[in-house]
């Protein structure tokens, strides 16, 4: 039971980390004042971490606020950077921002449900974030990620968790 709840909490945290890492991997050098985005995300990450509880349903709303805060800021970053870009990089930024916005909206609707349905809806939003970009790989390959950097970031996350 506790392992299942642990996975319920760690998976969104992992995905928030992945989303931010992927953004900075592709566009981090181009964004102005990245700390304006990172500092609020750190606050939301602290909120998520403080929401870890053996009875996850007791802290679900604060956890969700933390998760959505991080993801909304990431979506904003994609749309902000898209205004500075041209061609394929612009298309990729708008595409990812739009897909992730759909995931955020879906996850946010989990507040209207209780019990297992709540978690199902939350994970449906995360699944949208993960699966839809897989169908867009031809477009995304036009602005590739730096895989050695990603491997280092994933290794760091594993060590931390």
Q: What does each model-identified segment do?
A:
Residues 1-161:
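Multi-pass alpha-helical transmembrane bundle typical of ion/small-solute transporters
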